[in-house]
Amino acid sequence: MFARTVVVVCLFGLIAFGDNCRAQSDDVRSKQRFPSTYLYSVLNGQKGDKTTFRDSSGRAQGSATQSGSRISFRDGLGRAIGSAETSGSKTTFRDGSGSTIETATTNGERTTFRSSNGSNLGSASQARNNTTFRDSSGRSIGSAANSGNRTTFRDSSGRSSGSASSNRR
């Protein structure tokens, strides 16, 4: 069920795209209600029940725990900050109060992200073990490369900006 879906990759503006997360427009950020969080990702290859996100210095920034079709997200201090649930090709992200804040719809190798009001937030395209992320204008803003249960994130300049590792509980 999760072969093509799910992992939030930008917790607290540090994971996945570094400053690119913080550089998103106020309009986009206003639609996100996770604390300082920009939900961007769809990732192939995260096989574990729990995924831990780290910044480029190796510091833990948060986690995602999978249970069936639902994933629960926690920040770096272990506090619950929201969830994601997949049904068919669509993943719905909710904040801690249960309000929908974003959706991700997968069509083949491409996933499109939209805010709760339908605005285009960007996309992710997969090719083998690599995922490229683009903003709503189609500009590349980062990438992710999978190797086993570990994923390395890079910003648009190719600099390492974090990682994710999955382990079965």
Task: Pin down the residues of each PLM region.
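Bacterial N-terminal signal peptides
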Residues: 7-16
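Repetitive, compositionally biased segments used for assembly/scaffolding
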Residues: 25-169
